[in-house]
Every structure is written in structure tokens, then in C-alpha cells.
Regions:
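Acidic, low-complexity/disordered tracts enriched in E/D and polar residues
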Residues: 1-40, 44
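Long, charge-rich, low-complexity alpha-helical segments
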Residues: 31-89
Length: 89
């Protein structure tokens, strides 16, 4: 995935906060994925408008972390979700 990619959740896939259980879930047709707060923060930025470089920059600033470390983790996570067809680039 290159820096100009604009990741987004495909139609029918939703990120939701389950307030009763205090957890984030990624709801896809016939599948549910539990995601942690960090993954949810990444997915909230995947709106199809922001490029990957902008998402990484936002997260690096938010968490005061090196961009290269954030980028490696984000690319790995998004690649995994793309392989599961719950993310498009």
C-alpha cells in the first residue's frame, strides 16, 4: 500500500462502539471483528478522502510517535483488513 492510497470501509462495513460491552466492533456482512481502541482510531481516519500519508501524520502527532513506526503498523493492519475484504484502497 503506497502513501497515496485512500483507504475506506466498503459499503456495508461499519465501525461501531458497543457501549454496553465497552468495545469497538467492525461489522461486515455475516462477520464481526472486535478491534481495539488503537485500530478504531486508525479506522476512523479511513474515510476515502485522506491519503495514507495524512493518516500516518495525524496518528504520529496524536500519539507523539515516530512516523516510520506508525506507518509500518498502520500498513500492516490495513493490509490485513484489505485481505479480509473489510477495507478498500
Amino acid at each position: 500500500m503506497d502513501g497515496s492510497a485512500k483507504p475506506r470501509l466498503p459499503r456495508g462495513v461499519k465501525l461501531r462502539r458497543d457501549e454496553v460491552r465497552q468495545r469497538w466492533t467492525l461489522l461486515a456482512p455475516e462477520r464481526i471483528f472486535e478491534v481495539d481502541a488503537t485500530a478504531a482510531a486508525v479506522l476512523e481516519l479511513c474515510d476515502g478522502e485522506r491519503e495514507l500519508t495524512a493518516i500516518v501524520a495525524e496518528l504520529a502527532a496524536r500519539y507523539n510517535a515516530p512516523k516510520d513506526v506508525i506507518e509500518k503498523d498502520v500498513v500492516a493492519m490495513l493490509g490485513d483488513l484489505e485481505a479480509k475484504r473489510v477495507l478498500e484502497t
